[in-house]
């Protein structure tokens, strides 16, 4: 299941593409797989980093320089109260958003996200509207 999510993220991202995981915590299987099997510019964030390779950030009050230039933002099992913040940041930087919720949990966002079944996993995806600059 986790391999399938990582493969999907890799397929959506070319070499050098900036990808940000929000709420990395201690579960690093997906990020480790992405690092091992691709050349994306992967940044891990968490409000309470579990090690030095994770950048401290609170998605509800984000440091936007972390997310600028990101083509894809993803979060694995984020609490419902940050779903809308994830979407706001994705919109602000024009990034694709992937949320892998806990089983049975609803997505709580202002706009509808598409349910994607990929391999042995499922997740919700939102493609931000490109804003003119």
Swiss-Prot record:
One Pfam family hit: UPF0146
Protein name, UniProt field: UPF0146 protein MTH_1000
Family: Belongs to the UPF0146 family.
Organism: Methanothermobacter thermautotrophicus (strain ATCC 29096 / DSM 1053 / JCM 10044 / NBRC 100330 / Delta H) (Methanobacterium thermoautotrophicum)
Tree of life domain: Archaea
Record-linked HAMAP family: UPF0146 (MF_00341)
């Amino acid at each position: 299941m986790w391999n399938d999510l990582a493969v999907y993220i890799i397929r959506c991202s070319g070499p050098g593409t900036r990808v940000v995981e929000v709420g990395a915590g201690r579960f690093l299987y997906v990020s480790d797989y992405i690092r091992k099997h691709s050349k994306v510019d992967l940044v891990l964030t968490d409000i309470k980093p579990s090690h030095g390779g994770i950048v401290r950030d609170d998605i509800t009050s984000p440091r936007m320089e972390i997310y600028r230039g990101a083509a894809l933002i993803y979060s694995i099992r984020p609490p419902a109260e940050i779903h809308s913040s994830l979407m706001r940041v994705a919109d602000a930087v024009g990034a694709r958003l992937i949320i892998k919720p806990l089983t049975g949990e609803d997505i709580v966002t202002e706009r509808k996200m598409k349910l994607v079944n990929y391999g042995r996993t499922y997740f919700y995806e939102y493609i931000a509207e490109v804003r003119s600059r």
